[in-house]
Amino acid sequence: VVAIIGPSGSGKSTFLRCLNCMEDPTGGQIIFNGVDIADPKVDINIHRRHMGMVFQHFNLYNNKTVIQNIMLAPVLVRCQDLKKAKRHNRMLPLTNLFRKEKQEKIEITTSKSQIVAEARAKAEELLKRIGLEDKADVYPSTLSGGQKQRVAIIRALAMNPDVILFDEPTSALDPEMVGEVLDLMKDLAKEGMTMIVVTHEMGFAKEVANKVLFIDEGQILETGTPEEFFGNPKNPRLKDFLSKVL
């Protein structure tokens, strides 16, 4: 778990969005699963399947029910793969006429109805995990802020990501709602989920993070373990920042 802290406007959220290529970095590399995903030649959508993101303001679709929000990405991605496989098989006799090395037919072992059924079962399982199974068929507008953010987190989990990016997941919540979201994130950390978290929750960073980064004016000024970072900060700007927030 990597926690990213810093003053408002320092570039924390921009840094996170660059990791998911929602904003184009101006230089450098972003290596994810051995691939530089900042390379324009790389299909970023393939890698986004393995990188979940949770936003400050939840970003749930208000015109879809809770369970439809959770099912949307898994169904869309798997149906796209199914469509590509069917198209490949349909065109195979023609394309093999012009190839020395013949391609094989793709074995199709699923259907759209099966994909939807499996996604719904997974969504129901995730809702049960956070105690919101009774909210499956309601719309996000009926949920509290804490409930919306927990739904947003399990929506990211529905894709079985390798890493989840959290952009200030508690900053838009009432203080009494913060605990339920942090508890879920702590559970994910205990289960070994890789997380990069932009946060103002210093207690969470101290307790859960393996590494803490301090960003100011778009620069990473200091990194370290929570013990080093909070107990013996070296950068003067970080010392000043911590003196105001702790």
Regions found by a protein language model. Give the residues of each.
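ABC ATPase NBD coupling module
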Residues: 37-52, 76, 112-121, 229-233
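Catalytic Walker B motif of ABC-type/P-loop ATPase nucleotide-binding domains
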Residues: 164-167
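Conserved ABC ATPase signature
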Residues: 139-143, 147
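Conserved ABC transporter NBD signature motif
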Residues: 28-39, 87
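Helix-to-loop junction immediately C-terminal to a conserved catalytic motif
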Residues: 20
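Conserved signature/switch motifs of ABC ATPase nucleotide-binding domains
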Residues: 138, 159, 191
